[in-house]
Swiss-Prot record:
Alphabetized HAMAP family for the sequence: Ribosomal_uL30_A
Entries under PANTHER family matching the protein: 60S RIBOSOMAL PROTEIN L7, LARGE RIBOSOMAL SUBUNIT PROTEIN UL30
UniProt entry tagged with the keyword Ribonucleoprotein: yes
InterPro entries reported for this sequence: Ribo_uL30_ferredoxin-like_sf, Ribosomal_uL30, Ribosomal_uL30_arc, Ribosomal_uL30_euk_arc, Ribosomal_uL30_ferredoxin-like
Entry annotated with the keyword Ribonucleoprotein: yes
One of the GO biological process terms: translation
GO function terms (MF aspect): RNA binding; structural constituent of ribosome
Pfam families reported in the protein's UniProt record: Ribosomal_L30
Source species: Sulfolobus acidocaldarius (strain ATCC 33909 / DSM 639 / JCM 8929 / NBRC 15157 / NCIMB 11770)
Family per record: Belongs to the universal ribosomal protein uL30 family.
Name of the protein in question: Large ribosomal subunit protein uL30
Quaternary structure (record): Part of the 50S ribosomal subunit.
Signal peptide, first to last residue: none
C-alpha cells in the first residue's frame, strides 16, 4: 500500500506572498478548506514544507480516505455516485477507493473526470487551537500525522 497524504488548506489568501500562492495553486489548494490527496513523495513534501503555515497535512487511514473520496464532485454541487464511477472508470466505487489506496490511481491526475479540489466545511466545533500556531505547539497548521483523520471527520 502506498502511503497517502491528506492536505487541507486552513488559511485564506489575504497577505499571502506570491511564492506561497503559487505553490498552493500547484497543490490545487486555492481556497480555505480545500483538500487534496497525494502520494507521499519528496517533491510533495518539499512543497508542503514551504506552505506549512497555510495548510495542515498527515497520513490518511482507510476511514479518512473513504470520507474524502465521498466528498468528490462531478461539478459544483453534484456529488460523485457509484453509477458515475462505473460509467467513467469501469469499476465499482469500492474498487475505486481501493485502487487509490494501492496507488494504481492518483486522484490528483483525474481532474478531467472529477471537479478538484475536494471542498470541505469548516470543522464542527471549530478549530481546537489557533490557526496561526503550529500543530505541535497547540495550534492547527503544519504536520499532524494520523490526527488528520479526526479533522477530516469533523469537516465532512
Amino acid at each position: 500500500m502506498n502511503e497517502l497524504i491528506g492536505v487541507i488548506r486552513i488559511r485564506g489568501w489575504a497577505a499571502t506572498p506570491w511564492y506561497i500562492q503559487d505553490t498552493l495553486s500547484m497543490l490545487r489548494l486555492k481556497n480555505a478548506f480545500n483538500a487534496m490527496i497525494y502520494p507521499k513523495d519528496s517533491s510533495i513534501q518539499g512543497m508542503l514544507n514551504l506552505v506549512s503555515s497555510y495548510v495542515t497535512w498527515g497520513e490518511l487511514n482507510d476511514e479518512g480516505l473513504r470520507l474524502l473520496v465521498s466528498k468528490l464532485e462531478i461539478s459544483r454541487g453534484k456529488k460523485v455516485n457509484e453509477e458515475y464511477v462505473k460509467d467513467k472508470l469501469n469499476v465499482d466505487f469500492q474498487s475505486f477507493v481501493e485502487s487509490i489506496k494501492d496507488g494504481k490511481l492518483r486522484l490528483n491526475k483525474l481532474d478531467e473526470i472529477f471537479s478538484l479540489p475536494i471542498r470541505l466545511h469548516p470543522p464542527k466545533g471549530g478549530f481546537k487551537g489557533k490557526v496561526s500556531r503550529p500543530f505541535r505547539a497547540g495550534g492547527e497548521f503544519g504536520y499532524r500525522g494520523d490526527k488528520i483523520n479526526e479533522l477530516i471527520r469533523r469537516m465532512v
